[in-house]
Amino acid sequence: MTYGQIKDQVLQLLNQYSVAGTMVANTYNNQQDYLNRIPNLVNDAVMEIATTVRRIPAFLTLSLDEDSGLAYEEFGDRIRFELPEDFYQFKTGDTLVTTNEGHVFHGNRYMIEGRKYLLIPKREFQRGHVYTITYYRYPKLLALPPAAEDELDNVPETHYAIPFYVAAYLVIHDDSFLYASFYNKYEDKLAKMTPDISAEAHPVSDVYATSLGDAYGDIYWT
């Protein structure tokens, strides 16, 4: 769905789209104030949905070969890969890491450092292999000001909830009943979305841990 479509639906919910078949002018009532606030509220909704009920899967490649995969450096007895800027969290519940030959990569010990780096023991890597990791990314937000034809990120079913979120926050200080009606509809649509179900792996203590970072865990996802 495009930003222009979202904006039109929001104005329709607020009865600010047309009067007697004539499009409402920007100077009418609160129209321009609404138009000014809609883009940021759309981005708020896109981010909330993508980090809760419908996360966005993506893939990254790890390799020790030059000009392939993420940037890396040797860091003690580990290899430190720089995570992409849109990294949110690892996806678990399926084959998280595979080689280019289709083998599951059992890292046994990994570490996330400052949500920016992934550290994996050197002994787990082989040159000539390419390792693929599935992760969840942050959504791409609308540029400000957005163009009417700008596409929203995430799957289409998430877009149909966004107008209700935006409309709710446009009236939150003026009409508590209308706010509740819109926000309840937004939550109802989220609740009916097909969940992205996966088994979760939790960080565990590493008895051989060094002082290198923040979180340790086993890569057991298969």
Model-predicted regions and their roles:
Residues 1-222:
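Glycine-enriched, solvent-exposed interface loops adjoining structured elements
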